[in-house]
Design a protein with these regions (language model features):
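Non-catalytic terminal segments and appended small domains
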Residues: 1-147
Length: 147
């Protein structure tokens, strides 16, 4: 990966995928890598939780889900998510970032047009949408339909 600070171009994203820095349950299709980003994909399960949360230092999202899950929803054939509810969905992609590489996430514009609030959570996170340098682990989406 580049020694120059800034956003990784698609060529470096492709190299990160090839080297296992970015990996996924299913192969990452070419169209998923954009000029300076990668589109993250939902897994087949959503967990309805009482409220939004961050795991905090030394805690995992999976451990928090054991305590906070109200319902488990199969997304395989699609599902309707309830307005005003909070869902946590594991993403297909995971990361093994080098110690000098961090990440940021932001929703696609289509989520705003659909009036859905989304953000990314990582294990040990104290902040949404920020992935600490050297992070190694799964990624999760918090999804809250607004209308």
């Amino acid at each position: 990966m580049s020694e120059i600070p800034g956003i990784l171009p698609s060529q470096e994203m492709d190299a990160a995928i090839a080297s296992g820095v970015i990996s996924a349950d299913l192969a990452i299709p070419d169209g998923q890598v954009q000029p300076a980003s990668i589109d993250l994909r939902l897994s087949n399960t959503a967990y309805r939780v009482r409220a939004s949360f961050l795991p905090g230092a030394n805690a995992t999202v999976a451990d928090k889900l054991k305590n906070f899950t109200m319902h488990k929803i199969d997304l395989t054939d699609g599902a309707v998510l309830e307005k005003g509810c909070v869902y946590i969905v594991p993403l297909q992609e995971s990361l093994k970032l080098p110690a000098d590489t961090s990440g940021m996430a932001n929703p696609k514009s289509s989520t705003g047009r659909l009036d859905i609030f989304t953000r990314v959570i990582t294990d040990g996170a104290a902040e949404f949408d920020r992935i600490e340098a050297g992070y190694s682990g799964p990624l999760y989406a918090e999804i809250s339909p607004l209308t």
